[in-house]
């Protein structure tokens, strides 16, 4: 096993404990990232469905708005000059908010009206009904355009976030966790080998001690047989003392 396949670490009980903790942490991180990816994917699909529905509705609204414009011009004449002269500042404005989905910040756009309607009196002479319908249709078109822009921005943001999250999951699952597992297996193998070597060494020591003891006992027996060894007195043995007579 090469050094690239595992983490360089000295095999010990402490290293084994550390690797087990790292493995558990990596597995927990992978599971959390998978849950995050699932949550992002769910929201991604919801937004995709909403984009399709909004685009279909957008086509209908824009067709209706274009038809209303033609109808208003036919009824009220060319009112573009009047509109341009009355423009001071934008009445419809956009503001951005933030939405959070599993730690990913999504921009949310919404439109609002500021000030009074500068074209409220436009069309009093003729074509008032057609102009009011025209304003409603284009207001609806602006609302849908803002919603569509918000959805598409969130769509792109979520798509990138899902790709990054899935890459992290794959790296943890296919690179980090296997590397830790190989390191842990290496540590366990080395520790088992050390235990076997220690057991063999202790067994050899015991065998050597046994041989030395047997040899020592044999030499002692031979010396006893030759009378070279005097048995030491047993102080604990019971001996009868002679009576002492006192005159």
Curated annotation (Swiss-Prot):
Membrane topology: Peripheral membrane protein
Location relative to the cell: Membrane; Cytoplasmic vesicle, Clathrin-coated vesicle membrane; Cytoplasm, Cytoskeleton, Microtubule organizing center, Centrosome; Cell projection, Cilium
Keyword Ion transport in record: yes
Cellular component, GO annotation: centrosome; cilium; clathrin-coated vesicle membrane; proton-transporting V-type ATPase complex; vacuolar proton-transporting V-type ATPase, V1 domain
Top-level taxon of the source organism: Eukaryota
Pfam families membership: ATP-synt_D
GO process terms (BP): cilium assembly; pH reduction; protein localization to cilium; proton transmembrane transport
Annotated function: Subunit of the V1 complex of vacuolar(H+)-ATPase (V-ATPase), a multisubunit enzyme composed of a peripheral complex (V1) that hydrolyzes ATP and a membrane integral complex (V0) that translocates protons. V-ATPase is responsible for acidifying and maintaining the pH of intracellular compartments and in some cell types, is targeted to the plasma membrane, where it is responsible for acidifying the extracellular environment. May play a role in cilium biogenesis through regulation of the transport and the localization of proteins to the cilium.
Protein name: V-type proton ATPase subunit D
Source taxonomy: Eukaryota, Metazoa, Chordata, Craniata, Vertebrata
């Amino acid at each position: 096993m090469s050094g690239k396949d595992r983490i360089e670490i000295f095999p010990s009980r402490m290293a084994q404990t550390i690797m087990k903790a790292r493995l558990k942490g990596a597995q927990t991180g992978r599971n959390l990232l998978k849950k995050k990816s699932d949550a992002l994917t769910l929201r991604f699909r919801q937004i995709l469905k909403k984009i399709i529905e909004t685009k279909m509705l957008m086509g209908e609204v824009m067709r209706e708005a274009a038809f209303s414009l033609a109808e208003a011009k036919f009824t009220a004449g060319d009112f573009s000059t009047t509109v341009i002269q009355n423009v001071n500042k934008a009445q419809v404005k956009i503001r951005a908010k933030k939405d959070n989905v599993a730690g990913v910040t999504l921009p949310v756009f919404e439109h609002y009206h500021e000030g009074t309607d500068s074209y409220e009196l436009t069309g009093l002479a003729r074509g008032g009904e057609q102009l009011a319908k025209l304003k409603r249709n284009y207001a609806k078109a602006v609302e849908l355009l803002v919603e569509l822009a918000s959805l598409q921005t969130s769509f792109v943001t979520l798509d990138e976030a899902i790709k990054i999250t899935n890459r992290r999951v794959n790296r943890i699952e296919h690179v980090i966790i296997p590397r830790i597992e190989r390191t842990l297996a290496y540590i366990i193998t080395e520790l088992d080998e050390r235990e076997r070597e220690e057991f063999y060494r202790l067994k050899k020591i015991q065998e050597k001690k046994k041989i030395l003891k047997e040899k020592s006992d044999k030499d002692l027996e031979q010396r006893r047989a030759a009378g070279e060894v005097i048995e030491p007195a047993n102080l604990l043995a019971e001996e009868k003392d002679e009576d002492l007579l006192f005159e």
